[in-house]
Design a protein with these regions (language model features):
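N-terminal glycine-/charge-rich "phosphate-binding" loop or analogous flexible N-terminal tail
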Residues: 1-43
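Short acidic low-complexity segments
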Residues: 29-42, 56, 165-179
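Phosphate/diphosphate ligand-binding glycine-rich loop within oxidoreductases
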Residues: 41-112, 126, 211
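Alpha-helix C-terminal capping/helix-to-coil transition sites in glycosyltransferase folds
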Residues: 41-42, 61, 178-179, 204-207, ...
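Short glycine-/small-residue-rich Rossmann-like dinucleotide-binding loops
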Residues: 50-51, 70, 187-189, 215-216, ...
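Beta-strand-loop-alpha-helix segment that lines the small-molecule cofactor/substrate pocket
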Residues: 59-65, 75-82, 185, 189-231
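Rossmann-like dinucleotide/phosphate-binding beta-alpha-beta segment
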Residues: 123-207
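Rossmann-like dinucleotide-binding domain for NAD(H)/NADP(H)
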Residues: 208, 216-306
């Protein structure tokens, strides 16, 4: 079977090639479907990440779509059989979330900027131990965040529709916002919770709160984040995901600038890279091949999109 991989980066391609079975003929590109300009599907089975949009005209021409992602909101409504990878990167994303928290607490961007003058004024940061962390969305990733945070001595509360972990103290969103020093968004995206962390919502949080989003960019409207920073309501902001991310990624890759969150000393922006460890990329490659082999045998996916 021919499989075409979109949005594949160098290390990922190397891992996939290691695990490809003989009956799979693979083609790779770093482009999204839209960047590639493909008007017809290049293979019977295609694989994407979050920034490609499946053209409606490909329905009936493609047998299946494998998304190499833990989320699947970008596939909701697709009329082609779709699979995803729910388990490959939970710990990797959780580690990055805590990494971003630490970097903001210790004012790492300012530390780096002030090294050339070896200047320490204004660089006094904070420690994790004793801080109050609210994890919104206590699923696979959120659970790992809680484990790491508790090991660091943080006080942790969770917000979730399903309170399934006896070891986690759950609160309402409003109670959590009023309590937390730090908020991490690890939710699943649905059509009901777009813009969940709006200006109005985060204004109910304590002034100076640190906010991190490693889930989906649709939760955090860019204009709202700008206003909260300009008003000094957010003490720090870290994003790995972005509103209108597919358009933003294309603009940045083509050299366009002007993203309003760039260049702020209390903001850290990473290119949707929280999943990207050698261990997670290897798991992703193995599980992608599992999906493909299962699809060849059963015309369905081992982990289908619900």
């Amino acid at each position: 079977m021919d499989v075409h991989f979109y949005e594949a980066f160098e290390e990922e391609i190397a891992m996939l090639r290691q695990h490809l079975p003989a009956q799979v003929h693979a083609h790779f590109t770093s482009d999204t479907i839209q960047e590639s300009g493909d008007t017809e599907p290049p293979a019977e089975l295609i694989s994407i990440r979050t920034q490609s949009v499946i053209p409606p005209a490909w329905t009936g021409k493609v047998s299946g779509v494998v998304s190499r992602t833990t989320g699947y909101d970008h596939l909701v409504g697709c009329r082609i059989p779709c699979g995803y990878l729910p388990h490959y990167c939970s710990h990797a994303v959780a580690e990055q979330a805590i990494l971003l928290v630490m970097a903001l607490l210790r004012k790492l961007p300012a530390q780096i900027a002030q090294f050339p003058a070896f200047h320490r004024d204004g660089l006094t940061g904070g420690e994790c131990a004793g801080k109050k962390l609210l994890v919104v969305g206590v699923g696979n990733i959120g659970t790992e965040i809680v484990k790491i945070a508790q090991a660091l001595g943080m006080q942790v509360h969770g917000v979730d529709l399903v309170e399934k972990h006896a070891s986690i103290s759950y609160v309402t969103l409003d109670d959590g916002l009023a309590w937390a020093d730090i908020i991490i968004c690890a939710m699943n995206l649905t059509k009901e919770n777009v813009a969940y962390f709006s200006y109005e919502t985060l204004k109910r949080a304590r002034k100076g709160v640190v906010f991190v989003n490693v889930a989906r960019g649709e939760f955090t409207p860019t204009e709202d984040m700008v206003m909260l920073l300009d008003e000094s309501h957010l003490g720090g902001l870290a994003l790995d995901v972005y509103e209108n991310e597919s358009k933003l990624a294309v603009a940045l890759r083509s050299g366009q600038s002007g993203f309003p969150l760039l260049g702020r000393p209390n903001v850290i922006l990473t290119p949707h890279n929280a999943f990207n460890t050698a261990e997670a990329v290897d798991r992703k490659a193995r599980q992608t091949i599992q999906q493909i082999e299962y699809f060849i045998a059963h015309k369905w996916f081992l982990w289908p999109v619900p």
